[in-house]
A protein has these predicted regions:
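Signature of alpha-helical transmembrane segments and their immediate interfacial
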Residues: 194-196, 264-314, 355
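Solvent-exposed, membrane-proximal periplasmic/extracellular interface segments of envelope transport
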Residues: 2-10, 335-424, 479-501
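Helix-loop junctions and hydrophobic alpha-helical segments within the transmembrane domains
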Residues: 95, 102, 106, 172, ...
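Hydrophobic transmembrane alpha-helices and their membrane-interface caps
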Residues: 91, 118, 122-176, 234, ...
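Transmembrane alpha-helices and their membrane-interface boundaries in multi-pass membrane transporters
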Residues: 160-175, 196-216, 223-264, 384, ...
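Flexible hinge/switch segments at interdomain interfaces of large molecular machines
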Residues: 6, 47-54, 94-96, 250-260, ...
Length: 777
């Protein structure tokens, strides 16, 4: 038989039956001298409300490698099965359902990709004929199979769209022209592939290397967008393989040889468009110095104009959610914070378009997205998740709640922020001040905040130490304390017993373990003035004495409730947000003023916020970007075995900024991280087209054709493929203009590619004639 002297209580009532000794050597029941109750914490540590009603939250995360949509469907099915077991009066409400959001986002994006593919196929059918269009369109759809459906990988597929069709266009164009000249299908396919295989491979490899900085970037931004590089790697290599294998085979099967009455090479390019372009190109080459001067002038203007382009880091999410963070004065009771947070929540629910509010008081929500930035636990903090019917409704609700907080609750310190897609912070501009003395750091922070307040475009101005809190401190009388045998620790324990309660045991209730607290009655704890009457045991007198006998009195002081350090150095952050969308203009104004502050010896300043995030992302790219560009340059040199041809190609690359600047300024877009990816795509397209064109010129010159004629004929032969590749890419990006995540990237590629096409067809041959000293005639 097992003996188990656990001493556990079977019920709360049993606690009251515990016998304790008294001064009269008698035993009394605990329930005779104390009230024993089971209750919740008097001051909660955290509270949840959904639409103003008390709630409990359950967060569920997915295991790695699982399909989030499939997991969501299984969870929804299980929740429906458990609906009948929910107690009466309770209901299950979804705050954020990531599987649904992912499914909607991917489905919407797939529709956009489908529209883009349809546009691409339509353009090819219009300009290259039914059979060739069906060939390339079929190959394009083949590339879509097997690609994992998520935002970054689908974006990578759209970025690669122009490159995917370009390889097939070049091969199909060459075969079509040769067969129209009367050449047999097999011979036309063999000759076309033989002449273009290495140029296309070189262009494809360089296009892939343009994105290697993303895949090799070691920072969090590289991790977030790393799949983009691998999708482009696989899709472009596959496009090259199919362009030199499947495309010739299908062309040979489906295309019919034609008869060219002129019998020469110029027969397929004798149309009006080709003739006019030949004349314009000949004029540009004859006036090549003027052409170069004009292009260089446009480049200088674009570099200057790029300074006026808005700068951003990551775009915002499409999900119709945003956050309202409500900060009370530091040290506020959580119940006061709850009252104000519920007041804001009630106001929000009365606004048109607001479907749901979810409020947490005392700390952050469970982390429900990768980029959610949870705040620390604080009784002065509350966060409200606001769900609207559409994303377009957010600015209207945002403005109204911001005005309400400023006018009706001016004592609060609110932060309103959107749900981001990529990395980011609460404050876009952060000035970090480092030093040893908290008082000096607060003074420096106030100076920095004063500079921010002086700018009308700044809002949400604060520091992360927040306000000093009021503290009641007993002044221990050491002489009296020694005489009575009462130490500082015993004094603190007596005060803690009276105010908070002292844990003396644990009560097990099924699976719950509840603390047993002993504390003074409520009437003794309700008034600060009663603290001096609290008894503390004196071993010298062998009796309890009032706290007033051990202290000289109480003093009210202010102290820093929050002190933060960075790299083991005291650090305070003065921060703000712009009233508009972009932080860069405001940052550029306040940065020199804050840096002009006189810092005492031992104090320093550094910058955080979007500036630091952007610098880290660019630094991560900066460590891997040179390697990628070096490999691109080496590939172009090895491809030609000479230096002048790669020199022509790389002299044209910086000129892509002309189209980028013009497009972003005209569309009032911002150059963000996705725009950077679009620019890399643009570089790959530009280099690839230039490689194929220069390779064609070299082949014609090597075949004995006079230099000027070789440049004209080769460039005219590339007119249709280059324009088709550009048109398919530009038109294919139109559906993405409505997606906030890809809009700036789309503008960058569309505008940049338009000018890059002009560069390829006019400036590259002009530069070729200049560097190789080929004169007209």
């Amino acid at each position: 038989v097992r003996v188990s002297p656990t001493g556990e209580f079977a019920s709360v009532e049993e606690i009251g039956d515990v016998l304790i000794g008294s001064d009269e050597k008698r035993l009394v029941y605990l329930k005779d001298i104390a009230d024993i109750v089971r209750a919740y914490e008097e001051v909660p540590s955290k509270m949840y409300y959904v639409n103003g009603r008390p709630a409990l939250t359950l967060g569920i995360s997915m295991q790695s490698g699982e399909n989030v949509v499939a997991v969501g469907e299984r969870l929804s099915r299980r929740v429906r099965e458990l609906a009948d077991t929910v107690p009466v009066g309770m209901e299950l409400t979804q705050i954020y359902n990531q599987p649904v959001e992912v499914n909607n986002s991917v489905n919407g994006f797939v529709v956009s990709v489908g529209q883009a593919v349809a546009i691409v196929i339509g353009v090819l059918l219009l300009f290259m004929g039914l059979r060739v269009g069906l060939i390339i369109g079929t190959l394009l759809i083949m590339h879509l199979n097997g690609i994992e459906l998520q935002r970054i990988s689908l974006g990578a597929l759209v970025i690669a769209l122009g490159m995917l069709v370009d390889n097939a266009i070049v091969v199909a164009e060459g075969i079509l022209v040769r067969m129209q000249g009367g050449m047999r299908a097999a011979q036309a396919a063999s000759e076309t592939v033989g002449k273009t295989i290495w140029a296309l491979l070189g262009g494809t490899v360089i296009g892939i290397l343009a994105f290697s900085a993303i895949g090799l970037s070691p920072d969090s931004t590289g991790e977030f967008a790393g799949s983009l590089f691998y999708v482009i790697l696989y899709s472009l290599l596959l496009s090259w393989v199919t362009a030199i294998s499947t495309t010739p085979m299908l062309c040979a099967l489906l295309l019919k040889p034609g008869q060219n009455s002129e019998g020469g090479q110029r027969g397929p390019y004798a149309g009006v468009v080709f003739t006019v372009f030949r004349g314009l190109l000949a004029f540009a080459i004859r006036q090549r110095i003027l052409t170069v001067v004009v292009v260089v002038g446009l480049f200088v203007a674009a570099v200057v104009g790029f300074g006026s382009v808005k700068q951003a880091f990551f775009p915002e999410s499409n999900t119709p959610l945003f956050f309202v963070d409500v900060w009370e004065i530091e040290g506020s009771d959580i119940r006061t914070t709850r009252e104000d947070a519920l007041r804001v929540s009630e106001f929000l629910r009365g606004l048109p378009g607001v479907e749901q509010t979810t409020t947490v008081i005392g700390g952050p929500h469970e982390r429900f997205t990768l980029v959610y930035d949870p705040r620390e636990i604080s009784s002065a903090y509350a966060q409200i998740i606001v769900k609207t019917d559409t994303r377009e409704r957010i600015p209207e609700v945002w403005d109204k709640v911001e005005d309400y907080l400023q006018t009706q609750m001016p004592w609060t310190d609110p932060i309103i922020k959107s749900l981001r897609i990529g990395p980011g912070r609460d404050s876009k501009i952060e000035a970090r001040l480092h030093g040893p003395d908290p008082t000096v750091l607060r003074q420096l922070s106030e100076q920095a905040q004063a500079i921010m307040r002086a700018d009308p475009e700044a809002k949400d101005i604060r520091d992360d130490w927040r306000q000093p809190v009021k503290l009641v401190r007993p002044v221990y009388n050491e002489q009296v304390g020694r005489q009575l045998g009462i130490t500082r620790e015993e004094l603190a324990a007596a005060l803690r017993f009276a105010v908070e309660g002292t844990p003396v045991g644990r009560y097990r209730d099924g699976i719950r373990v509840l603390p047993i607290l002993v504390r003074a009655p409520d009437n003794e704890r309700a008034d600060v003035g009663n603290l001096q009457d609290i008894n503390v045991w004196s071993p010298v007198l062998d009796q309890a004495v009032p706290v007033a006998q051990v202290i000289s009195g109480f003093e009210t002081v202010f102290e820093n409730a929050v002190l933060r350090s960075r790299d083991r150095i005291r650090t305070i952050i003065a921060s703000c947000n712009p009233t508009g969308e972009l932080a860069t203009p405001l940052f550029n104004r306040v940065k020199p003023q804050i840096e002009a502050l006189e810092l005492p010896p031992g104090y320093s300043l550094s910058w955080g916020g979007e500036y630091e995030d952007s610098q880290k992302a660019q630094s991560g790219l900066g460590r891997s970007l040179p390697v990628g560009f070096l490999l691109m340059i080496l590939t172009s040199i090895l491809l030609f075995g000479k230096l002048r041809q790669p020199l022509i190609i790389w002299l044209t690359v910086p000129l892509a900024i002309v189209g980028i600047t013009a497009g972003l300024l005209a569309a009032n877009g911002a150059f963000d991280f996705m725009s950077l990816l679009g620019a890399l795509s643009l570089i790959g397209l530009l280099i690839k087209n230039a490689i194929v064109l220069i390779d064609e010129i070299d082949q014609q010159v090597a075949g004995g054709k006079e230099g000027f004629s070789a440049i004209l004929d080769a460039t005219v032969s590339r007119l249709r493929p280059v324009i088709l590749a550009a048109a398919t890419t530009i038109l294919g990006l139109i559906p993405l203009l409505s997606d906030v995540f890809f809009v700036n990237m789309s503008i960058t590629i569309m505008a940049g590619l338009g000018f890059a096409t002009l560069l390829t067809l006019v400036f590259v041959p002009t530069l070729y004639s200049l560097i190789f000293r080929i004169r007209p005639g």
